[in-house]
């Protein structure tokens, strides 16, 4: 579990905190989404989860290890994998398998274990056939898959995705979400997805909304997403399916506003045919 207690963070020479009095437990086997408009503190929180930043006040503990403990920081960063929006910033080699092997090599693992981890990680993201390719010639979605594989080769318990799909086309987003679902369900990886896009958050177990550096609400997609007024007040764009339901309801066919899935929407409409 990642335990956050009374967390406040100030950037150097800033008078106002980027995060203020955050307390949150990220549970085992959880798919957690952190939402918020730009400047709400989401990316700052991501960097605090694995010790890239250290709290100004309060504490962050990863499986009982305090991120402020210099003796534990390497173990914490192995446990908490962090993925950013631009994969080019995390790809460093001229060959896919070399890039994925970089992390395990730095752990001092033997050659056989490194090979096993590289193969397993590429298989998890369905990129085995690209192991000898140059990352520069891959699509944005494929590059992000390789970045995920590189993180997963470190065998993290937690995967933090900081706007990791924001620069990817719709097809690439679907492919990466499939990989993330697989990691969560089959590998037991705790997923912490930081985004402003509700479409990426529909499968979350819980949703945390940040506003001006504070936790505004903790809810579930089923509770929060149908409320267009609440979402707009939080600076979040409602799901496209919510717009469709609202338009249909204006035509006199009264559909449930709780529907979040297009297949369920079609099924509901068929009841009126």
UniProtKB/Swiss-Prot annotation:
<dbReference type="InterPro" id="IPR030947">
    <property type="entry name" value="EcfA_1"/>
</dbReference>
<keyword id="KW-0067">ATP-binding</keyword>
<dbReference type="Pfam" id="PF00005">
    <property type="entry name" value="ABC_tran"/>
</dbReference>
<keyword id="KW-1278">Translocase</keyword>
<dbReference type="GO" id="GO:0043190">
    <property type="term" value="C:ATP-binding cassette (ABC) transporter complex"/>
</dbReference>
<dbReference type="InterPro" id="IPR003439">
    <property type="entry name" value="ABC_transporter-like_ATP-bd"/>
</dbReference>
<dbReference type="InterPro" id="IPR050095">
    <property type="entry name" value="ECF_ABC_transporter_ATP-bd"/>
</dbReference>
<dbReference type="InterPro" id="IPR015856">
    <property type="entry name" value="ABC_transpr_CbiO/EcfA_su"/>
</dbReference>
<dbReference type="GO" id="GO:0042626">
    <property type="term" value="F:ATPase-coupled transmembrane transporter activity"/>
</dbReference>
<comment type="function">
    <text>ATP-binding (A) component of a common energy-coupling factor (ECF) ABC-transporter complex. Unlike classic ABC transporters this ECF transporter provides the energy necessary to transport a number of different substrates.</text>
</comment>
<dbReference type="InterPro" id="IPR017871">
    <property type="entry name" value="ABC_transporter-like_CS"/>
</dbReference>
<keyword id="KW-1003">Cell membrane</keyword>
<comment type="similarity">
    <text>Belongs to the ABC transporter superfamily. Energy-coupling factor EcfA family.</text>
</comment>
<dbReference type="InterPro" id="IPR003593">
    <property type="entry name" value="AAA+_ATPase"/>
</dbReference>
<protein>
    <recommendedName>
        <fullName>Energy-coupling factor transporter ATP-binding protein EcfA</fullName>
        <ecNumber>7.-.-.-</ecNumber>
    </recommendedName>
</protein>
<dbReference type="InterPro" id="IPR027417">
    <property type="entry name" value="P-loop_NTPase"/>
</dbReference>
<keyword id="KW-0547">Nucleotide-binding</keyword>
<keyword id="KW-0472">Membrane</keyword>
<dbReference type="GO" id="GO:0016887">
    <property type="term" value="F:ATP hydrolysis activity"/>
</dbReference>
<feature type="binding site">
    <location>
        <begin position="36"/>
        <end position="43"/>
    </location>
    <ligand>
        <name>ATP</name>
    </ligand>
</feature>
<comment type="subunit">
    <text>Forms a stable energy-coupling factor (ECF) transporter complex composed of 2 membrane-embedded substrate-binding proteins (S component), 2 ATP-binding proteins (A component) and 2 transmembrane proteins (T component).</text>
</comment>
<keyword id="KW-0813">Transport</keyword>
<dbReference type="GO" id="GO:0005524">
    <property type="term" value="F:ATP binding"/>
</dbReference>
<feature type="domain" description="ABC transporter">
    <location>
        <begin position="2"/>
        <end position="237"/>
    </location>
</feature>
């Amino acid at each position: 579990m990642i335990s956050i207690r009374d967390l406040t963070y100030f950037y150097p020479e800033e008078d106002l905190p980027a995060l203020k009095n955050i307390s949150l437990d990220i549970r085992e086997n959880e798919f957690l989404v952190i939402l918020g408009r730009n400047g709400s503190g989401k990316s700052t929180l991501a960097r605090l989860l694995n010790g890239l930043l250290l709290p100004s006040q309060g504490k962050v503990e990863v499986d009982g290890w305090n991120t402020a403990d210099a003796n534990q920081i390497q173990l914490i960063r192995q446990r908490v994998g962090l993925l950013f929006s631009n994969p080019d910033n995390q790809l460093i080699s001229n060959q896919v398998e070399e890039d994925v092997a970089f992390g395990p090599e730095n752990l001092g693992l033997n050659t056989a274990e490194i090979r096993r981890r590289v193969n397993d990680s590429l298989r998890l993201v369905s990129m085995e056939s690209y192991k000898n390719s140059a990352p520069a010639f891959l699509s944005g979605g494929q590059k992000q898959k390789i970045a995920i594989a590189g993180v997963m080769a470190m065998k993290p318990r937690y995967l933090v995705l900081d706007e990791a799909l924001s620069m990817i086309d719709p097809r690439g987003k679907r492919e990466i979400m499939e990989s993330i679902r697989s990691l969560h369900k089959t590998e037991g990886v705790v997923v912490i997805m930081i985004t402003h896009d509700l479409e990426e958050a529909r499968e979350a177990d819980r949703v945390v909304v940040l506003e001006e550096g504070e936790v505004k609400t903790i809810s579930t997609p089923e509770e929060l997403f149908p409320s267009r007024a609440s979402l707009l007040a939080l600076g979040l764009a409602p799901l496209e399916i919510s717009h469709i339901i609202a338009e249909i309801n204006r035509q006199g066919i009264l559909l449930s506003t709780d529907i979040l899935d297009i297949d369920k929407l079609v099924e509901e409409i068929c009841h009126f045919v």
